[in-house]
A protein has these predicted regions:
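Bacterial Sec-dependent N-terminal signal peptides
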Residues: 1-22
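Carbohydrate-interacting regions of secretory-pathway proteins
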Residues: 17-244
Length: 244
């Protein structure tokens, strides 16, 4: 299995520092305690958009996939901002569903959460049109959305659970999917700026997003973890974070 330099370095640091920090559950499997809905449509209500079903957070869509999708907003874990961490979760999507997991997100008045944060893409690759857009599959599941494709692309079909992990340490970020490392990149570097310049978040295409993302995490390089409501049925469970 491919192993990130970051993962090796973090492991060495943790060993040298004594006992490993314990992972903390962000979701108790029963209710949405600790989570806050940020809705873009005033006609929507948090209690119907986000529910708990069989021990999982369910984002409730139209049931019509892309044809009936309506962007609902985001669900953020509002109890704490995270800086260096390892986030693990499981997800599954309905047919044609689109969602994502945000990290280092900021609350910006008048702006949706997602424009301030990198996104671990969550998608039904086989049935959502976004899978064929972007460049080289960089809008498929586990990709850094619209910037880096997840390789290998090992997402399971809709209706099946996937395991996922995001590791962030001093600006180095690694995405994992179903037990495999699928990408690595470095925030706040010339590489990061170059990726933004080539994406839908470029200064020319989306200046508000660019200004936030170029220094994502803000002055302290920390932020919220969030789940995207893109108008489709998606489930998340076993959401755990370990601070590094």
């Amino acid at each position: 299995m491919k192993k990130s330099i970051l993962a090796v370095a973090v492991a060495a640091i943790l060993i040298s520092c004594g006992p490993k920090p314990a992972a903390v559950s962000l979701f108790n499997g029963k209710d949405l305690n600790g989570w806050t809905a940020v809705l873009e449509d005033s006609t929507l209500h948090p209690s119907t958009e986000f529910t708990v079903e069989d021990g999982a957070i369910k984002i409730n869509g139209s049931g019509m996939g892309e044809a009936g999708a309506q962007d609902g907003g985001d669900l953020i874990y509002a109890n704490k901002k995270f800086k260096n961490f390892e986030l693990e979760f499981e997800y599954k999507v309905d047919k044609g569903a689109n969602s994502g997991v945000f990290y280092l997100a900021q609350e910006i008045p008048g702006q949706p959460i997602f424009i301030s944060a990198p996104e671990y893409q969550v998608l039904d690759n086989a049935n959502h049109p976004d899978a064929k857009l972007g460049v080289d599959g960089n809008r498929q599941s586990a990709s850094l959305y619209d910037m880096i494709p997840a390789k290998p692309q090992n997402a399971k079909p809709f209706g099946e659970w996937n395991t996922a992990k995001i590791m962030v340490y001093n600006g180095t970020v690694v995405h994992y999917q179903n037990g495999e490392q699928v990408l690595e990149y470095h925030l706040w570097t010339p590489q990061w700026k170059e990726m933004l310049d080539k994406s839908k978040f470029s200064k020319e295409k989306w200046p508000e997003a660019y200004d936030l993302l170029i220094n994502c995490g803000g002055e302290n390089h920390e932020g919220y973890i969030g789940l995207q409501d893109h108008g489709d049925d998606v489930w998340f469970r076993n959401i755990r974070v370990k601070e590094l």
